[in-house]
Each structure stands twice: as structure tokens, then as C-alpha cells.
């Protein structure tokens, strides 16, 4: 197989679903992200390793990080996205792909939903769209999904979307405060049998 420099790989954007417009992060997203992090802090601090200190997520700090993320997107090192509700334009979900292996054509996906938009199916819709996009637009062979033990919301989405349970890595996830949690691993290798969803890019 001929190796292609990842920088030259086309990543068509945005991704559209019936309720979401999912796009790369852009200049000016920092304040909006800081607001969503503050709103959702209790849940993020429970599950996300990066949610260690609340005072670290200022609008300025988030804008700086946004611009680093934009550079990573151009270099194809990471794909961090924001999902906006199609009808209102409100940002409701932060999602994307990480641990991308372009040569092996595999990656992991993940997300978090701001508190005011939870329990409305946005995570399931976005995860479905991202899996379809990974296989259809990015040519991935494997899409992984992991979560910490006890994160039942993520487990239910993995099951609902037909991600195969691959096993448990004991104590592999580090949570805020240095706590360790078992990592539950799921994966898909194609979109066969996934719930129907209209996705365009």
C-alpha cells in the first residue's frame, strides 16, 4: 500500500445529520467552550482526565487550546469537532477522533454533551454520524470507543450502535484526582446493522 502523507488526506466538512451540524473547531470557539465546560463541570470532572482544575478552563485558555486544535486538524494529528443544533446553531456536543493511525486506518471516537443538551439523543446521533463518516469519508477499517467502568451512558450508546465489546483493560483509565478506573473497549469494523441515520458531508 502506498503511504500518503496525512497532511494531504482530504477531510470533507461539515458533517450534517437531521439535527446536527458537526464542524471543526474555529477561531472564536474558546469562550463558548469555556461556558459549556463550566455548565457541565460536575460530570466532566467525574469522567474526563483533562477536567482536573475548574479554574484552568477560562475563555482565554480555551481559545488558546482551540487554536492548537486547529493546527492539529491541519496536520491531521487529531480531529476535534463541535456539533451545533441545526435549528438554533447552539453548540451542544464536543466530539471527534483521536489516536488516529492513518497508515493502519484506525482511530477512536469520543464526545461529551453540555448539561443543558443532555438526554435528548445528541450523543447517539453524533456517534452514529461519526462512525459512518470514519468508514465512508476517512476510509477507516476500525473505529474504537472506550469508556471508564461505571459510565453507563457511554456503554448504552456503544450497545445501541452495535459496537462490539472487546474487553476490559484493568485500571487503564486515569480520572481526575489520580484515580484509576477500568477501561471498557468497544469497536466497529463497518456500518452494517447500524441504526439508520441520514448523514451528509
List each model region and its residues.
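A short helix-loop-beta-strand connector motif used in the catalytic cores of GNAT acetyltransferases and
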Residues: 53-54, 67-82
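Conserved GNAT-fold acetyl-CoA-binding loop/helix
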Residues: 43-67
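Generic, well-ordered alpha-helical segments
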Residues: 25, 36, 54-62, 75
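Acyl-donor (CoA/ACP) binding surface of acyl/acetyltransferases
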Residues: 1-32, 36-46, 80-201
Amino acid at each position: 500500500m502506498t503511504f500518503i502523507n496525512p497532511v494531504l488526506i482530504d477531510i470533507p466538512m461539515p458533517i450534517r445529520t437531521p439535527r446536527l451540524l458537526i464542524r471543526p473547531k474555529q477561531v472564536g470557539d474558546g469562550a463558548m467552550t469555556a461556558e459549556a465546560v463550566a455548565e457541565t463541570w460536575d460530570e466532566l470532572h467525574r469522567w474526563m482526565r483533562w477536567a482536573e482544575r475548574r479554574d484552568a478552563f477560562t475563555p482565554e485558555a480555551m481559545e488558546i487550546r482551540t487554536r492548537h486544535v486547529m493546527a492539529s486538524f491541519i496536520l491531521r494529528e487529531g480531529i476535534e469537532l463541535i456539533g451545533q443544533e441545526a435549528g438554533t446553531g447552539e453548540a451542544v456536543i464536543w466530539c471527534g477522533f483521536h489516536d488516529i493511525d492513518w497508515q493502519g486506518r484506525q482511530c477512536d471516537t469520543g464526545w461529551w454533551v453540555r448539561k443543558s443538551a443532555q438526554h435528548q439523543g445528541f450523543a447517539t446521533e453524533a456517534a452514529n454520524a461519526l462512525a459512518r463518516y470514519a468508514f465512508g469519508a476517512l476510509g477507516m477499517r476500525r473505529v474504537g470507543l472506550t469508556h471508564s467502568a461505571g459510565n453507563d451512558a457511554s456503554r448504552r450508546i456503544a450497545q445501541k450502535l452495535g459496537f462490539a465489546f472487546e474487553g476490559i483493560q484493568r485500571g487503564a483509565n486515569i480520572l481526575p484526582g489520580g484515580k484509576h478506573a477500568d477501561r471498557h473497549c468497544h469497536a466497529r469494523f463497518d456500518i452494517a446493522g447500524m441504526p439508520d441515520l441520514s448523514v451528509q458531508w
